[in-house]
Amino acid sequence: LSIRRQRQMCIRDRLLLQALKLEPKNAKNALLFSNLGLVQRRLGEFDKALESYSFALNFAPLAVPILLDRAAIYMEMGKTDRAYTDYCQVLDEDKQNKEALLMRAYIYVLRRDYPAARIDYNRLLELDPQSYSGRLGLATLEQKEGKFREALEILNKMLAATPEDATLYIARADVEREMKHEDLALVDLEEAIRLDAASADAYLLRGNIYLAQKKKGLAKADFEKAISLGVPPADLHEQLRQCK
């Protein structure tokens, strides 16, 4: 952000805090704290934003939008257990909240609680059968449970509808890799890179396939490309060592 923009936001912060001090019991303070949290989040001040959202929830403990905002910050900070609690509270208030269903399902997958994840994905897809994130999440779940054909069926249908989506080609390539269909995976990754040459995930996955095939030169080139696109070098230290 520009210095001018930062100053404007600091002034806004001070005005909000002044309003809170003038009327500490005003129910509208929930909105003020929520707005302050939004500003702080945009500045990357996640700890301050969490504090603001928590203050807002003191005034309006069942406010779904504020719970969702706080949960999103918890997710960005890697605090998935706290995010989970907020998403559960959202769903207690609104059983059809699609964002909460999607994110809670994702957390269940991280926890390897696949039956619970499937329940939430199925609920989401009942509400919104064309949900991109819901279908992609379910495909990932099928893959993690070793149900590769089911995962491919979902991804093939999605690609039929959106054939220019690089993310879907990468997802399908990863399933094909696990099925030992490396040649098919490489074709999909080539298409993904054609559609999005800045996709670090595509180079990373292709590099791993090349490494498994003992094509060390090709693997090294892809890993180095992934690093140039933002993958931390430390994450690929072992792979690059194996390329020597």
Tell where the protein language model's regions lie, with residue ranges.
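Conserved structural position within tetratricopeptide repeats
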Residues: 18-24, 54-58, 88-92, 122-126, ...
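Single conserved hydrophobic/aromatic residue that forms the stacking wall/gate
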Residues: 1-7, 11
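Register position in tetratricopeptide repeats
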Residues: 5, 42, 76-77, 110-111, ...
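TPR alpha-solenoid repeat register
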Residues: 29-32, 66, 100, 134, ...
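Residue-level recognition of tetratricopeptide repeat
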Residues: 26-29, 63, 97, 131, ...
